UniProtKB/Swiss-Prot annotation:
Segments for region (Involved in binding clathrin light chain): 1219-1528
Annotated segments matching region WD40-like repeat 6: 264-307
SUPFAM superfamilies attached to this UniProt entry: ARM repeat (SSF48371), Clathrin heavy-chain terminal domain (SSF50989)
Main location: membrane
Record's bilayer topology term: Peripheral membrane protein
Annotated function: Clathrin is the major protein of the polyhedral coat of coated pits and vesicles. In yeast, it is involved in the retention of proteins in an intracellular membrane compartment, presumably the trans-Golgi.
Chain segments carrying region WD40-like repeat 4: 153-198
Protein name: Clathrin heavy chain
Organism: Saccharomyces cerevisiae (strain ATCC 204508 / S288c)
Renumbered residue ranges of the record's region WD40-like repeat 3: 108-152
Region (WD40-like repeat 1): 23-66
Length: 1653
């Protein structure tokens, strides 16, 4: 496929990422761009969204989501979620922020991102847009327009807009004429009008037309397939035409090709690549169409997927299209930039179109055409068009073309070709480096900087340092822009400094990683602007990359030395932010300078705790001198210094001073407090109190109290303790506070403390208050009240005659304690008048119950009578009042019975207990009123008051109470029962108590007593003789306890419920009595039921029915006979009753018993009144059983309501096929009719009927029958309808194969491949069948349909069939390159396709296969080995490979390979190559290798070569020794082989005089005068003059050393002359500093004192 004009890629398989196929559809999966795929999933009732990030290696992120739809932003991690159709929320997943949250008025049907910022919505009536990033979270979308009527009843599938968001199109599809039709609503925002268009897809795009310069034309592209004719059409029209443009786009219309078998296919997506001018149109069935945008020419059509596509998005910056099919494959298509132009030239033979495409996109493939056209136009002197052609071709955009066009003179009045060339390029895009430089010079020279700047801003120029150099003389700022774009860092820094934009230097250096000389920059800035210099230095410090490059001490010294204290301080404050110990001297320095020159600054520095490592004693002393006592105290540690400073309270903030004591220990704190009090106690007492209050826990309250007491500071003590008393747990502290408050006469405070405080010792405080005898006794009253010293308090107050405080206590403090006060006063024999007066003053506030208790203890109740009566008159309804009055009336015998009966307010229990010993009857009255059951029963039993008890029980009518008194353990039960029967019952007229009494008797097992009671009530004259309930109860009791009396009771009694009594009789086996009751009350049906079900005599029942002779009884007896399986009798009874209502049971039982003959009359009777399917169905079944087919035909021909499907099924089960056929035919049930025809042997009719049924199960049945009868043509018809269902394939194939019908099976699948519903399983199964039975056809089938088969399944089949070529083909197309390569190695020893093997093996993932392949080639294909190794080199472990061949002694086989990999300079490769060259005695190649590549054991190789027989190798060994500075070894070999030139070079290279002198000596000794002279020349600088003179004198070589001597003399003279000149210059003038060096000033040079650093 390398020559195709498209590149086809599978981006990801969503199912392989865990996405369930059930969610791969248009509603659940959204695809806004080639960045994200979003899938909404539901699992276990929980919604989640899976986000597949295609740009991050298909990373899957899952998030819980409560919504029903979600889409991702095209490029950002922004997700939009929709819930309930109307609620929309948009989140940024990276920042975890909410961008939008709103609720629409109607549900969103479709939504899509229209741009990077705008989201579009389509509802049932409206089209809306929302700017997601406008910052307004709650803003609702804006209404764009209303939906057009042409979108009614459509499914919205797309919403698009142009770049300016002023044209919009909404696309919908619907079913029409059996096809999918498309509708488009085109809307113009500016004109506010909509237009309805037919179409399935739409998109807006731009195109540059020839002659319009760089201004594009807007076009609207639509694709449509006519629902009526099926014809496809692509339309391209211009919108918003600009009349000022010379060229106008002409409307283009092109046919869209659809294959004949794709009748239901339609366009589903369209994308346009503006860069290349290509339209991509994708159809539902996976066909991709390519069109050229300007001409509308169809370029290419192919199918990219066999599965249907449901969504698509732009791909690769909108230069391609991506889509998702139903199997979850994300597929992408874009043009092949290298093949599209050749394809148009070669396949379409359209040269003009090829040039258009190549020109627009700058694509290769038409370079020769451009070159020829360019040359032709030049020859024709058509320079303008030649320039345009050159600008249109990337291959012609070079310096040669520029030079040629520059040298052409334009005709008069015409634009020069070079300017036309540049203008064309600028219209189309960006100039390259050479073009920019060529254009810049003339433009700037003509002073057209604005034009140049315009091009620069539009990014039309490629910037370089050379361009900046050209621009700088004209405009430094413009040059800076060029340098910035070109990355010329040094030039950028220079320009920024020249423009004084210092603040931009550091950010730029950080950005580009450039390091300038900061000291020089800072020095220059200090001179011009100290503030800016300080800011610049601070910025350097704040940058971790530059902070380490500067010396902060030197910089600070520069500031301070020039008296820039503020700037130097600011710098050091930033520099010393770390506050580390090593910065201590600098911290001290900053503080010293500022304490001397700016104390306020020093105060602020110390106050902010910026430093902690300075010299604190020194700074403290300076602070004290400067009057900064606070700072001095913060740094002093000696108590003497602290006490000296701390007394300056007027200069110290009080809050700080108080807090300062927290830094002192207890002893120091006390010393300072004493110093403050000694200095000026009046002025400092407030401070002392605050300190004592804050640090009370630390110093101790006792110590502080003693301190205050020692100085007699009562007021201070009071205020100090006031701060503690509410929080302390110390009793002594509270006591001291009460004492101090008493001295200060703060009685209200004492009152507050004793009232609210819970810590003090009440006994101690009470005694203190009694002894203090305060003017106000209220604190004492409160203490005694709180801690229950009331009695003692009353005694103290009564004795001291403080009666007003007694009244105050009762009236104001605690009226609830009045009872105790009264008791105490009574104990003191206080005057009753005072007591009564006291009580009258607190009327309504006294707890009367307690009061009466206290007074009752002292037998003085009568004293309360006036108080109680006054209380009642005041409306007090307290129960205790009535209790007390009752007791007083009882004791005084003042009409107590009347009071107890008439009054309801008293406590009946309390008063009753009070009366029990005085008068039991009064107690009975009280208990009866209060329904105090237990006490009433007790006193009536104790006092033999049984008749009162009986009356009370009957009146109460409480079953639980009855059960209690009737308990057999009650010794008084008999007397009570007698009283109830003799006295209680005769007095009653209400039946309810009687009934409850009876129930109580029954509950307590009083059987005989109950019957006795009931007989007396009912059988003797009483108001209850005719009571239904009691008569029933009597019968019930008799049934249970005296069954023999039941018959007599039935005769005597009439007023009872027969429906209740008769079932009880049956329950207790009194069946005849039950029959008598029913018969007596004329309940014939129930009487008959007793005969049938209980007495179980059907004959007696039949006689009874005959006697009564009603239809109801006949129906009832018929049902009983049916249940007893007397079927004929039952049917006869039903017929007599003319009752068909029980037809279901009659039919079921009769059919089970086979009584069809008897059943038919019943059914005919039933059909007269009922129209029931079961009746008609049963009649058909009965006729069928009796073989009355004619009657069935007559029945079916007439009116009937039978469920013929169900009846047919029953007949089919009973093998009554003829009758079944009649039923199925009558309802046109082709599925079952086909099955029936199969059993009737009519196969052709069965197939025809199965086609009408179109049911898999039917096709299978008919197919099985046809196969069994060898009706293969009919079987194939059935099979073709089965194989399109993948789940039926296995069973169908097994059926054919088990019968040996292989050819017929293959023929079936071959015929099925052309079906529209052909699926992967069919192609797969046919491939397997070919591999088994017709292997020759396998490869061809695989090559045609490899993309449509299940490759793993076919791999197993071809492997079993030993089809190795096919196996390799499948492995390769399944990307299992490892298996493909291994199969080729194992199975292709002879007929190996070397080129194909190389293509396969380079793609393997397991590199061990490389080495298997190498061994395979060594063994079978050694001549191709080097070519293989060359292909494998990029991933090959070369050392390992070389070792393999070294061990097997096969290095010569890979010599070219070794040469090829030598540049990698690997030691193993080098060693192997050396071995090979030594073996081949190729010294030249060896020399080149050791010179070029140094990674090998050089000394080891030298040692090997030293002993080689050839002198050339020995020379190489010597050179290796020389390279490793083994001079002696090297010279030894060279001297031995007389290689004098190399020896002289070696000695000179050594730079060692000893080596040189040794070789000189050797030359003298061996008489080699030429070598001696040559060495003197080569090593001239290494030889000592004295050594040369000596050896030449001793060996008479003076003439040979003359040149050497002359050179030495000349050097000496030159040196002397030079020294003389330098001395003369120094004596003439002093040496000056050189310009350009950094200014490094020392303290001494600036005449300043040492800074203390």
């Amino acid at each position: 496929m390398s020559d195709l004009p498209i590149e086809f890629t599978e981006l990801v398989d969503l199912m392989s990422l865990g996405i369930s196929p059930q969610f791969l559809d248009f509603r659940s999966t959204t695809f806004e761009s080639d960045h994200f795929v979003t899938v909404r999933e539901t699992k276990d009732g929980t919604n989640s969204v899976a986000i597949v990030d295609l740009a991050k290696g298909n990373e899957v992120t899952r998030k819980n989501m409560g919504g029903d739809s979600a889409i991702m932003h095209p490029s950002q991690m922004v997700i939009s979620v929709r819930a309930n159709g109307t609620i929309v929320q948009i989140f940024n997943l990276e920042t975890k922020s909410k961008l939008k949250s709103f609720t629409l008025d109607e549900p969103v049907i479709f939504w899509r991102w229209l741009s990077e910022t705008t989201l579009g919505f389509v509802t049932a009536r409206s089209i809306l847009t929302s700017n997601v990033f406008d910052g307004n979270v709650n803003a609702k979308p804006q209404l764009l327009t209303l939906r057009h009527a042409n979108l009614n009843n459509t499914q919205i599938i797309n919403f698009v807009a142009n770049k300016n968001l002023d044209w919009f199109a909404v696309v919908g599809i619907l079913q029409e004429n059996g096809r999918i039709a498309g509708r488009i609503q085109l809307f113009s925002k500016q004109r506010n009008i909509s237009q309805a268009i037919d179409g399935h897809v739409a998109i807006f795009t731009n195109i540059l037309l020839e002659g319009n310069g760089s201004t594009p034309v807007q076009v609207f592209v639509t694709g449509n397939r006519n629902a009526t004719t099926g014809a496809g059409e692509l339309r391209i029209i211009e919108i918003d035409h600009d009349a000022s443009l010379p060229s106008q786009y002409q409307k283009e219309t092109t046919d869209i090709f659809f294959p004949p078998d794709a009748t239901n296919d339609f366009p589903i997506a369209v994308q346009v690549s503006e860069k290349y001018g290509i339209i991509y149109l994708l159809t539902k069935y996976g066909f991709i169409h390519l069109y050229e945008l300007e001409t509308g020419t169809n370029l290419f059509v192919n199918r990219i997927t066999a599965e249907s596509v449901f969504t698509a998005a732009p791909y690769n910056h909108e230069n391609g299209i991506a889509c998702i099919n139903k199997k979850g494959q994300v597929l992408a298509v874009e043009i092949s930039t290298s093949q599209i132009v050749p394809y148009i030239l070669n396949k379409l033979s359209n040269v003009a179109l090829a040039l258009i495409v190549a020109t627009r996109g700058g694509l290769p493939g038409a370079d020769d055409l451009f070159q020829k056209q360019f040359e032709s136009l030049l020859l024709q002197n058509d320079y303008q068009n030649a320039a345009k052609v050159a600008a249109s071709s990337t291959s012609l955009r070079n310096q040669n073309t520029i030079n040629r066009l520059k040298n052409i003179q334009a005709p008069p009045g015409a634009i020069s070709p070079i300017l036309l060339y540049f203008s064309t390029l600028l219209d189309k895009g960006k100039l390259n480096k050479e073009e920019t430089i060529e254009l810049a010079r003339p433009v700037l020279q003509q002073d057209r900087k604005q034009l140049f700047e315009k091009w620069l801003k539009e990014d039309k120029l490629e910037c370089s340092e050379e361009l900046g150099d050209i621009v700088k003389p004209f405009d430094t700022t413009l040059a800076l822009a060029c340098y910035l774009r070109a990355g010329a860092h040094a030039k950028v820094i220079s320009c920024l400094a020249e423009l004084q934009q210092f603040e931009k230097i550091i950010p730029y250096c950080q950005k580009v990683g450039y390091q300038p000389n900061f000291l020089v920059l800072i020095s220059s800035l200090i001179r011009s602007s100290p503030d800016r210099a300080s800011e610049f230095a601070v910025s350097l410090l704040q940058n971790p990359e530059t902070a380490s490059q500067i010396d902060i001490e030197k910089i600070a010294d520069l500031f301070f030395s020039q008296n820039h204290i503020q700037q130097g301080t600011s710098l050091l404050l930033d520099a010393l932010k770390g506050d580390t110990p090593d910065q201590g001297h600098l911290q001290t320095r900053v503080l010293e300078v500022n304490l001397l020159h700016a104390p306020q600054v020093a105060d602020a520095i110390l106050g902010n705790n910026i430093f902690s490592h300075y010299d604190k004693p020194t700074i403290a002393s300076l602070s004290e001198k400067a009057g900064l006592y606070q700072r001095a105290l913060e740094n002093y540690t000696d108590i003497k210094d602290i006490k000296r400073c701390v007394v300056h309270t007027n200069a110290l903030p009080i809050d700080w001073l108080v807090g300062y004591f927290g830094k002192l220990n207890v002893e120091q704190s006390l010393a300072c407090l004493k110093a403050l009090m000694d200095n000026n106690i009046q002025a400092n007492i407030q401070t002392v109190v605050q300190v004592a209050t804050k640090f009370s826990d630390l110093i101790g309250p006792s110590t502080l109290i003693k301190l205050f007491e020692d100085y007699n500071a009562t007021e201070g003590l009071y205020y100090y303790l006031a701060s503690l008393v509410n929080l302390t747990e110390d009793k002594d502290v509270v006591y001291k506070y009460i004492e101090a408050a008493a001295k200060m006469k703060q009685y209200r405070e004492i009152e507050r403390i004793v009232k609210d405080n819970n810590v003090y010792d009440p006994e101690r405080v009470k005694n203190f208050l009694k002894d203090a005898n305060l003017e106000d006794q209220l604190p004492l009253v409160i203490v005694c009240d709180r801690f229950d010293f009331v009695h003692e308090m009353i005694l103290y107050l009564y004795k001291s005659q403080n009666l007003k405080f007694i009244e105050t206590y009762v009236q104001q403090v605690n009226p609830s304690k009045t009872a105790q006060v009264v008791g105490a006063l009574l104990d003191m024999d206080c005057d009753e008048a005072f007591i009564q007066s006291l009580l009258q003053s607190v009327l309504g506030q006294v707890p009367i119950n307690e009061l009466t208790t206290e007074v009752e203890k002292r037998n003085r109740l009568k004293i309360l009578l006036p108080f109680l009566e006054q209380s009642l008159s005041q409306g007090i309804q307290d129960q205790a009042v009535y209790n007390a009055l009752a007791k007083i009336y009882i004791d005084s015998n003042n009409s107590p019975e009347k009071f107890l009966k008439e009054n309801d307010q008293y406590d009946t229990l309390d008063v009753g207990h009070y009366c029990e010993k005085r008068d039991p009857y009064l107690a009975y009255i009280a208990y009866e009123k209060g329904q105090n059951d237990d006490d009433l029963i007790r006193i009536t039993n104790e006092n033999s008051m049984y008749k009162y008890q009986a009356r009370y029980l009957l009146e109460r009518s409480d079953l639980d109470l009855w059960n209690k008194v009737l308990n057999q353990e009650n010794i008084h039960r008999r007397q009570l029962i007698d009283s109830v029967i003799s006295v209680g019952i005769p007095e009653l007229t209400d039946p309810e108590p009687v009934s409850l009494t009876v129930q109580a008797f029954m509950t307590n097992g009083l059987k005989l007593e109950l019957i006795e009671l009931l007989e007396k009530i009912i059988l003797e004259p009483s108001p209850f003789n005719e009571n239904v309930a009691l008569q029933g109860l009597l019968l019930l009791s008799a049934i249970k306890y005296e069954p023999t009396k039941v018959s007599s009771y039935i005769e005597k009694l009439d007023n009872y419920d027969a429906d209740e009594i008769a079932p009880l009789c049956i329950e207790h086996d009194l069946k005849e009595e039950a029959f008598e009751i029913y018969d007596k009350h004329e309940m014939y049906g129930k009487a008959l039921k007793v005969l049938i079900e209980d007495i179980m005599s059907l004959d007696r029942a039949a006689s009874y029915a005959d006697k009564i002779n009603t239809p109801e009884l006949w129906s009832q007896i018929g049902t009983a006979q049916l249940d007893g399986l007397r079927i004929p009798d039952a049917i006869e009874s039903y017929i007599k009753a003319e009752d068909p209502s029980n037809y279901e049971n009659v039919i079921d039982i009769a059919e089970q018993a086979g009584k069809y003959e008897e059943l038919i009359p019943f059914l005919l009777m039933a059909r007269k009144t009922l129209k029931e399917p079961k009746i008609d169905g049963a009649l058909i079944l009965a006729y069928a059983e009796l073989n009355k087919i004619h009657e069935i035909e007559n029945l079916l021909a007439g009116s009937n309501v039978a469920n013929l499907d169900h009846v047919g099924d029953k007949l089919f089960e009973n093998k009554e096929y003829k009758a079944a056929r009649l039923c199925y035919s009558a309802v046109s049930n082709y599925s079952k009719l086909a099955s029936t025809l199969v059993y009737l042997g009519d196969y052709q009719a069965a197939v025809d009927t199965a086609r009408k049924a179109s049911n898999i199960k039917v096709w299978k049945l008919v197919n099985d029958a046809c196969i069994e009868k060898k009706e293969f043509k009919l079987a194939q018809i059935c099979g073709l309808n089965l194989i399109v269902h993948a789940e039926e394939l296995d069973e169908l194939v097994e059926r054919y194969e088990s019968n040996g019908y292989f050819e017929e099976l293959i023929s079936l699948f071959e015929a099925g491949l052309g079906l529209e519903r052909a699926h992967m399983g069919m192609f797969t199964e046919l491939a397997i069948l070919y591999s088994k039975y017709e292997p020759d056809k396998t490869f061809e089938h695989l090559k045609l349909f490899w993309s449509r088969i299940n490759i793993p399944k076919v791999i197993r089949a071809v492997e079993q069939a030993h089809l190795w070529s096919e196996l390799v083909f499948l492995y390769a197309h399944y990307d299992e390159w490892d298996n493909a390569a291994l199969t080729l190695i194992e199975k292709s020893t002879k007929d190996l396709d070397h080129a194909y093997f190389k293509e396969v093996v380079v793609k393997v993932s397991n590199l061990e296969i490389y080495y298997k392949a190498i061994n395979f080639y060594v063994k079978f294909h050694p001549s191709l080995l080097v070519d293989l190794l060359t292909s494998l080199t990029p991933r090959l472990d070369i050392p390992r490979t070389v070792k393999i061949f070294s061990k097997s002694d096969n290095l010569p086989l890979i010599k070219p390979f070794l040469i090829n990999v030598l540049p990698k300079n690997n030691s193993v490769v080098n060693q192997a190559y050396h071995d090979l060259m030594i073996e081949e005695e190729d010294y030249k190649a060896l020399q080149d290798a050791v010179d070029s590549y140094d990674k090998f054991d050089q000394l080891g190789l030298a040692s090997r070569l030293e002993s080689h027989k050839l002198i050339f190798f020995k020379k190489i060994g010597a050179l290796l020794y020389r390279r490793n500075k083994k001079w002696a070894k090297s010279l030894s070999i060279l001297k031995e082989e007389k290689l004098w030139k190399d020896a002289i070079e070696t000695a000179a290279i050594s730079q060692d005089p000893k080596v040189v002198e040794a070789l000189l000596t050797y030359f003298v000794e061996t008489g080699n005068r030429e070598g001696f002279v040559a060495l003197l020349y080569a090593a001239y600088n290494l030889v000592r003059i004295e050594f040369v003179l000596e050896i030449s004198w001793m060996n008479s070589l003076e003439d040979y050393i003359k040149p050497f001597e002359i050179s030495i003399k000349k050097e000496q003279n030159d040196s002397i002359k030079k020294i003389t000149e330098e001395l003369a210059k120094k004596s003439g003038s002093n040496e000056e500093h050189k310009d350009g060096q950094p200014l490094m000033l020392m303290n001494s040079a600036m005449n300043v004192q040492p800074t203390g650093f």
